[in-house]
Amino acid sequence: RRVLFRSNESYFMFRNEFCEQEIYLIENKISCAAPAFILCSADIHLHRKARLCRLSRMGALSQGRMLRVMRIKITIELSEKRFPADYRRAFLHLMKNALSTYMNGIYFQDFFPEGRPQRKEYAFAVGLPQGSACRGEYFDLGKNGIVATLTTGNPTYYILLYNAFRRLKGKQQLFMKGVSGRVASVRPASQPPVQNDKILVDFMSPLCVREHVDRKDRYFSVEEPDFYEQVRRVVSYQLTEKDWITDGMLEGFRIYPHQMGKTVARFYTEQLECSLGSAVLCGEPRLLQELYDNGIGSRCSAGFGVFRILTT
C-alpha cells in the first residue's frame, strides 16, 4: 500500500482497543467542508470497538479534551545493560534502518536528503535510565532498556515514522560489539496544545546553539554571556521559512533559564557544549507550539532540543 498525502485542514484517526496496528492514510469521502483523509489501521473495520478521534492541526478531541498526538514513544529492549556512549548516533542508525526498509525505502530521502544540509521537521531525544554512568565507549545503564521520543509537527512525517518503526518491531539490531536490541513497543504520546504565551519546560535532550562562521562551528551554553541572543538568533533562523511567522513573533520570543546548566554532549567525533535543565519560554503560543513539535535550537534532527512542558 502507498501512503497518500493529506491536503486539507483536518483528518481522522481510528484507534483499535485490542492491539496496536499500522497506520495508513487512505482517501475517503466524508461529509465535511473539504475533502478529507482517514488514518486507519489495515483491518480496523473488522473490530466493533474501534474508536474515532477527530484530529486537526490543533490536535485530537478525546473525551472532550483537546490533545495533540504528534510524538512517538519507542521502547528498545537490549541484550545487555549497556548502550553506546554516542547514543544519538546509535538511534540515528536505527532510524535509518527503519526508513530504508519501510516501503522499500521510498521515503528515506525525505528524512535524510542528499546534498546541502537543510532544516528537518522532526527531532528526537534518547532517554537513558536514571543513574546511568558513562564507562568510556558505553553507558552502564543498570537496566536493559531505553526509551526514545520522536517528535514532529508534520502529520505525514508522523505517520511515516510511526509505520517505519512499527515494521521494525521485534527485529534484532546491533548497536555495538556484544550489545544488540529490538524495538519492543511503538506508541503515540499526547500533550495538550500550547495556549499560553509562557511555558515552563524541561529539556529531554540538550539545547544545542551553534554559530557557523568561516567554516568553523562555535557552540554556546547557558554559561556564555550572549547565550540569550544566540538562542533567539537560532530560533529566528529555524523558523524563517514558516510563512506565518512575523517579525513581531520573533522579536517577542524569550528564554529564561530556570534550573539549567552547561553539559557536554558527544556526537560522532565532536564534543558539543550545550545546555540542559529547565527554562521558561515566552512568546506567541503558535511559535512555542512549533518549537515543541519540531525542537528548538541547532541539530534537532540529530537528537537535540526536545523538551517536555511542565506547566502552561
List each model region and its residues:
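Short, small-residue-biased leader/transition segments that mark boundaries at the very start
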Residues: 1-4
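Intrinsic-disorder-associated, low-complexity terminal segments enriched in Asp/Asn/His/Tyr and depleted
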Residues: 11, 16, 24, 28, ...
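RNA-interacting cores
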Residues: 24, 37-40, 61-312
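Short, Lys/Arg-enriched N-terminal segments with co-localized hydrophobic residues
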Residues: 44, 48-69
